[in-house]
Regions:
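Conserved catalytic-core motifs of GNAT/GCN5-like acyltransferases
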Residues: 32-38, 106-109, 133-138
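Vicinal oxygen chelate
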Residues: 18-19, 73-125
Length: 148
């Protein structure tokens, strides 16, 4: 039995069409597909395991939003934190694929110690994803919200 050197995150989420999910996560986001059945597909999402489970569209949850920095941020979302330079490359990849941004790439908390770039997209099943990068990754879990 092999040891896992770094814990891996696992997330299972609903999709309404597996082939659309495969196209979005592999061709647009850059994931590779792993195991699959006629009801689910595993994706390697930046080294973490996503599992897209096929559901009836009527059973897919509605996403509520929360106001953050003047934007209606989907309360239910997932994503990854990239290096600053990787984020710029990733934005270019999304633009080249003509992905519609739910929240266009922008600089949040500009000039403050928590400065970050962020964007939101939606997959074909209306699952929301956030991709962001911190100017200083040490601020990821900083508790000083007043000076963030």
């Amino acid at each position: 039995m092999s040891k896992v050197s770094q814990p891996r995150f696992h997330l299972a989420f609903p999709v309404t069409d597996l082939e659309q999910a495969r196209s979005f996560y592999c061709d647009v986001i850059g994931c590779s597909a792993g195991r699959e059945s006629d009801r689910w597909i595993d994706f390697d999402f930046f080294g973490h395991q996503l599992v897209a489970h096929l559901v009836d569209p009527a059973d897919h949850p509605f996403a509520a939003t929360n106001a953050v920095d003047g934007h209606a941020v989907p309360a239910s979302h997932f994503g990854v934190i990239l290096d600053w330079s990787q984020h710029e490359i990733f934005v270019a990849r999304l633009k080249a694929a003509a992905v519609e941004f739910v929240i266009k790439p922008y600089l949040r908390f500009e000039g403050r110690k928590g400065e970050q770039v962020t964007l939101f997209v939606r997959d074909p099943s209306n699952n929301y994803l956030e991709f962001k990068a911190f100017r200083d990754i040490e601020m990821l879990f900083d508790k000083d919200i007043d000076n963030y």
